[in-house]
Amino acid sequence: MGKIIGIDLGTTNSCVAVMEGNEPVVIANSEGKRTTPSVVAFLNEGQGERKVGDAAKRQAIINPQNTISSIKRFMGKRYSDIAEESKLVPYQLEKGNNDTVRVRIGDRTYTPQEISAMILQKMKTTAEDYLGTTVKEAVITVPAYFNDAERQATKEAGQIAGLEVKRIINEPTAAALAYGLDKKNQDMKIAVFDLGGGTFDISILELGDGVFEVKSTNGDVHLGGDNFDQKLIDWLAEEFKKEESVDLRKDPTALQRLKEAAEKAKIELSGSSTTEVNLPYITAIDGVPKHLVKKITRAQFEQLVDGLVRRTLEPCKKAMQDAGLTVADIDEVILVGGSTRIPKIQEEVEKFFNKKPSKGVNPDEVVAVGAAIQGGVLTGEVKDVLLLDVIPLSFGIETLGGVYTKLIEANTTIPTKKSEVFSTAADSQSSVEIHVLQGERAMARDNRTIGKFHLDGIPPAPRGIPQIEVTFDIDANGILNVSAKDKGTGKEQKIRIEASSGLTDEEIKKMKQEAEANAEADKQEREKVDKLNTADATIFQAQKQLQELGDKIPADTKKSAEDAIEELKKAHEAKDIAAIDTAMSKVNAALQQLYAAAQQAGQAEGQAAQEPSQSTGNAQAEATDAEYEEVK
């Protein structure tokens, strides 16, 4: 069995790890960094090259509307759900079929799954470069509070990227697995506080005898580092607006500069009590350039984000209640996600749990490490570890009067299966609609629809007589399968809730083919750039050699070398790869002739220099002899 890599597909950054022997290893990308920005950029309105990771992030200021970041916020979401979130990004979002979200780039649109697949492809390539072999399987992490549609969308992104997703696991659970692997024989209860770029999760786990059991989970999929940045962006923009009467948020380039400056200031304020935002030439008013220069203290920043910090505490209380524990029962608190570096967050966590959080894990890497360990469990490399995860939200169906009837409660350990018998609501009813929902509200309309299907062919009977058995089956990824069976006729209808993310199997297959084609195109683009760079270096070297050897070689050899170099220059300017290959061969052949001619010229000079010295030597010998004879 090949390696199963572990991928933390984050809102802001992504990370990949793999088991090597008994140890998980975080793999550095081609730029030598252990995390990769979850950013995809399209050049020339989508007609040019595509960049992923650091290269995409670096060009964001000059290309904000075609640079996609924080795509995780839109995974599995309906367009009607994203009104607020769409304001946080500079790129254009559109409504697709079935109220799905689409990203507009030039003359085409992409699904969030396709954009995420591009990031996953980058992580896959990073792992393949390190391992020296093709990677086909992965464990991918998701926020614990992701619903069915969001989990399914993540799985689809993996498929589009050419990965068989062996398991979807919750980020806090992965972090606990990484933290507790060397403590698996200890009995302990841990809280994982996970505040990332776009989501917040809190999970309570119990460890003992190699079993990692999630007792409860809670969270907020609309709360993360992006929101903290946004508070700073709004403050800076409002301060500038007071002084200059211009709203910088209406200019995509200025907004992107503000966004990057806010993120940088937030990070700096974790280590110092004050920082300065300095953005020269942020805009021009009546042709006069304007600069934004603002000092901000940590106290001011904490005041701005106080509401966000407090929003993390309610899920913590709920998770503790659901686990049936008090803070005194918690042995260790683990901080996960870059946003937990904010001192105010650390203070509030310490205050809530009445203990200092553990500093024993790297918050940026621990989730990928846990995913790699789970990959090792699946391949058999990691033994004596059992992971028992839970579903974050209840599953159920709509029943008479628009009531939401739960079949499987939140925080139920997965995999799990539950059946319940329902009946018809009217006499002679021959068909029933099964409306599958996820959520915690009492009425169906207030919960999230994740699928609908019909069971037809029910024999006519008075209401309440037919026996319809509805079965919910949740797999280890937290993804739901539903079936409905008429117990009288044995007729059954099944549905795998996959359409909840808005993509059919056929669409996924097509996107996978496109992704593979793009991967090939990207590879060819890289090869083209490499070839152009090699040609450029060859031209430089050849000209240098020609200059150095010019006087020592015959005119015809020199002329053929100059012609070959000129041909390569033209091919390089035209970016004609076939012509470059031909011209490179000619230049290399000409260089060989140059070296050979220079060598011959050198040998000829050497012989010429040697002959006079020999005759001089003879003359001296003769003179010496004569003189000697004369004295004698």
Swiss-Prot record:
Q: Which residues carry this modification: Phosphothreonine?
A: T199
State the CDD domains in the record. ASKHA_NBD_HSP70_DnaK-like (cd10234)
Q: Which domain of life is it from?
A: Bacteria
Membrane-crossing residue ranges in chain numbering: none
- Give positions of region: Disordered: 597-632
Ranges of Polar residues composition bias in the record: 612-621
Q: Which UniProt keywords apply?
A: ATP-binding, Chaperone, Nucleotide-binding, Phosphoprotein, Stress response
* InterPro entries tied to this protein: ATPase_NBD, Chaperone_DnaK, Heat_shock_70_CS, HSP70_C_sf, HSP70_peptide-bd_sf, Hsp_70_fam
Family of this protein? Belongs to the heat shock protein 70 family.
Identify this protein by name.
Chaperone protein DnaK
Source species:
Amoebophilus asiaticus (strain 5a2)
